[in-house]
Amino acid sequence: MTKIASIADVLQGEIAVGEKVTVRGWVRTRRDSKAGLSFLTVYDGSCFNPIQAIINNDIVNYESEVLRLTAGCSVIVTGTVVESPAQGQAVELQTETVEVVGWVEDPDTYPMAAKRHSIEYLREVAHLRPRTNIIGAVARVRHCLAQAIHRFFHEQGFYWVATPLITASDTEGAGEMFRVSTLDLENLPRTQAGTVDFNQDFFGKEAFLTVSGQLNGETYACALSKIYTFGPTFRAENSNTTRHLAEFWMVEPEIAFATLADNAKLAEDMLKYVFNAVLTERRDDLEFFSKHVDKDVITRLEHFVNSPFAQIDYTDAIDVLVKSGKKFEFPVSWGIDLSSEHERYLAEEHFKSPVVVKNYPKGIKAFYMRLNDDGKTVAAMDVLAPGIGEIIGGSQREERLDVLDKRMVEMGLKPEDYWWYRDLRKYGTVPHSGFGLGFERLIVYVTGVQNIRDVIPFPRSPRNANF
């Protein structure tokens, strides 16, 4: 029986020249020669490059089917692997049979016809866009990065924890959350005071989609020592920018008995590990991005993995920015949250390497970050990368109950709403640290694709929840 193989296996030499093989996939192009030959390029998504199938006009269905094949038709091709005289490919298939599995019913209206489409147009046909070179390459890189993240944490002795998507707490204290409710919007139950009676809702109280798995993750870190979460998170932020999604994935490790320095080391090790993985495993896709999207993709990643991370205190970073003589759009002064232009100046022009900025003013950071001895700053950190700015945000968590309570009250939160989170500090508290990595932001950095909506299969953003 003829072996069925992926196109990746054939092109990478897993199937020997002279061996008979069957590949299954979709037609990218067909061209016919006057000499009675047809050349099909067939892809199956297993790698960037398609395979070329040479078809003689003496096969049974040549006139009836092969000459009618158009982009998008699905086929099963059986033939012998032969060395290719053509440039850019080592082997091709000398075809014996072509079975047409599915036709494109009307080639003239097929949205993925064989021409280059704008990335904006592809968002309108998100169900078909993985058939294109660019989105297919993004999907493979996304998979590679996800697998590398899981592998890294497993090798480091971390446990993966599934944190809930439905929650009653706001991790960031930002309030931009999607409500989860089964109440009849046409007939909302009311309390005597006239407010919505959430006691009659599914959970008996207000519930939301999570903005972060961090608080839940901390509970497991304070029992299993090293954990990470990796899952979807949601922000009801009305931002129509190239950097924002309403639904995105987050990687959030938490480590017990860890300081901010341990946290920064973990972030550096993880990023270098996953970038090395993608440079090794998805070179073909990165070469495509380098050629057609961002010429610096490969050199940027190689520079990143070979650069020691710089470290600087926020206060010193402000000093560097003030003394730079550069005119920034957003003025620089102590107490501001660094904007993208500030972050990129530090990483790209000042340090020319990834940099960890740490010890931020407490007023611009979340309640759970550990208050430093100066009483003005917290043990927070951001990892800034050349080419994008902030890629990771994290902190040492506040392990002292009295300080945590005070911070909550300062920020207008009710400590009683976080009773279970406070329990971690009451029963065997430990210093612990963690960070958050926006997964799609990581993919943007690796691929050079500029819009975050193009690195997630079905983007969710204001007024857009199609498919």
UniProtKB/Swiss-Prot annotation:
Family: Belongs to the class-II aminoacyl-tRNA synthetase family.
Pfam families per the UniProt record, alphabetical: tRNA-synt_2 (PF00152), tRNA_anti-codon (PF01336)
Catalytic activity, reaction form: tRNA(Asn) + L-asparagine + ATP = L-asparaginyl-tRNA(Asn) + AMP + diphosphate + H(+)
PANTHER family tied to this protein: ASPARAGINE--TRNA LIGASE, MITOCHONDRIAL-RELATED, ASPARTYL/LYSYL-TRNA SYNTHETASE
Location within or outside the cell: Cytoplasm
Entry keyword annotation includes Protein biosynthesis: yes
EC number: 6.1.1.22
Subunit architecture: Homodimer.
Annotated protein name in UniProt: Asparagine--tRNA ligase
Record keywords, A-Z: Aminoacyl-tRNA synthetase, ATP-binding, Cytoplasm, Ligase, Nucleotide-binding, Protein biosynthesis
GO MF annotations, alphabetized: asparagine-tRNA ligase activity; ATP binding; nucleic acid binding
Family annotation (InterPro entries): Aa-tRNA-synt_II, aa-tRNA-synth_II, aa-tRNA-synth_II/BPL/LPL, Asn-tRNA-ligase, Asp/Asn-tRNA-synth_IIb, NA-bd_OB-fold, NA-bd_OB_tRNA
CC per GO annotation: cytoplasm
Family matches, as HAMAP family: Asn_tRNA_synth
Gene Ontology BP annotations: asparaginyl-tRNA aminoacylation
